[in-house]
Each structure stands twice: as structure tokens, then as C-alpha cells.
Amino acid sequence: MTHSKRWLEEHEKDPYVKRAKKEGYPSRAAYKLLEIHQKYKLFKPSMNVIDLGAAPGGWSQVAKDLVGPKGVVIAIDLLPIQSMLDVIFIQGDFNEPEIFNQLEAIVAKKTLTGQVDLVISDMAPNISGIKNVDQSRSLHLVELAWDCAQKLLARGGTFLVKVFQGPGVDRFLINLRPYFNQVKFLKPSASRSRSSEIYILAGEFLGYNQRV
């Protein structure tokens, strides 16, 4: 059996995939975020949130449900996402100055401080099947997400990002720790056990220019 056929069979049998279809989420990834929230209380009503690499939209949908009508969720991705009531969507690469400026302008317009309480990212690279290549690309996306977060995250805010385990992750964590009071690795049960994906949860942002 080829890798693709094996993946399709597992995908069709996956209980989270079946649950997502039943409950109206665009992907099983929603349950990873819900599980993390249930344990760490990421979201509060009226929060302002940026979802980087938001397609197909599951995390944005969860975020909007949890921050409520007074909260703001800004989703950004190169790919389109399903239309969601009250989620602001930007299609483009947030690493491009023009798109980042658009993101920054929306944050300034929609928040009192020009900053957000939470930056989340479930981004993954296009998978090549070559483990070290995919892991390196994943780490690069994490670094881009952090570069964006440090510019728009309010003091006391939270940064949640997915990464594939491998070289450079521990070094990234060492570099990240001075900017937050709490940094930890997470592996939600909704993540497939054979997947190398983990999540970095960094809480109580100290401010980019105020690190200890």
C-alpha cells in the first residue's frame, strides 16, 4: 500500500475527522485547539486574536466561538478559507510588507491598543515527505510567526504555534523564553501519535523591548 492510500484510509477512519464533519468544523485541527483551551484557558470573551496560516478555518471558527461577539478574530492565509460570520480574513503572505501593513492597520482599527491578546498558528509547510526538509521548513514558519507576533502581541499576551520536532526547536525555545514568563511544549491527544508535530505555548508576554 502506498503512503497516500494508507493516509486516506487512516483519515477516513479517524474519529476526529468524523466528528469534525458532524459538528461543522472544516478540519480535525479544531479539536487540538479546543483541547488546549480546555486545559489552559487560552480564550476569554472580548479577546482580540490573530490566526496565522488560518486555512481551512477551523482554528478561526473555534476562536470566534470562544471570544464571542465583542471579540475580534483576524485570520490570514495564502489560501482562501470558508466564509465565517464576524471573522476578518486577509488573503496573502503576512511576511510581505504590504500584507503585514494591512494586518497592522486592521489591528489598529479594531483594538484600543493596536495590539492583540493572542497570536495562534497551526501552519505547516507543504509536505515533501523528506523528514529533515519538512522539519526545517516548519521551523522557518515558526520563526516567521514569532516575528509577526512580537510586533502585534500585547504585554501579558499569549503565543501558540505548531512546529515539527527536530533540530533547531530547542534553540528556538531558548531564544523565546526571555520574552515570556511561561513557555512549554504540548502534544494534544487530537494530534496523530505518529506525527512529529508539537505545540509551543508561550504565556505572559513581557514585551519585545522589555524582556528580562
From Swiss-Prot:
Catalytic activity: uridine(2552) in 23S rRNA + S-adenosyl-L-methionine = 2'-O-methyluridine(2552) in 23S rRNA + S-adenosyl-L-homocysteine + H(+)
Residues the entry annotates as binding S-adenosyl-L-methionine: G57, W59, D77, D93, D122
Keyword check for Transferase: yes
Keywords: Cytoplasm, Methyltransferase, rRNA processing, S-adenosyl-L-methionine, Transferase
Catalytic residues (UniProt): K162
Broad class of where this protein is predominantly found: cytoplasm
E.C. no: 2.1.1.166
Stored Pfam families: FtsJ
GO CC aspect terms: cytoplasm
Methyltransferase as UniProt keyword: yes
Annotated GO MF terms: rRNA (uridine-2'-O-)-methyltransferase activity
UniProt subcellular location: Cytoplasm
Function of the molecule: Specifically methylates the uridine in position 2552 of 23S rRNA at the 2'-O position of the ribose in the fully assembled 50S ribosomal subunit.
Family the UniProt entry places it in: Belongs to the class I-like SAM-binding methyltransferase superfamily. RNA methyltransferase RlmE family.
Record protein name field: Ribosomal RNA large subunit methyltransferase E
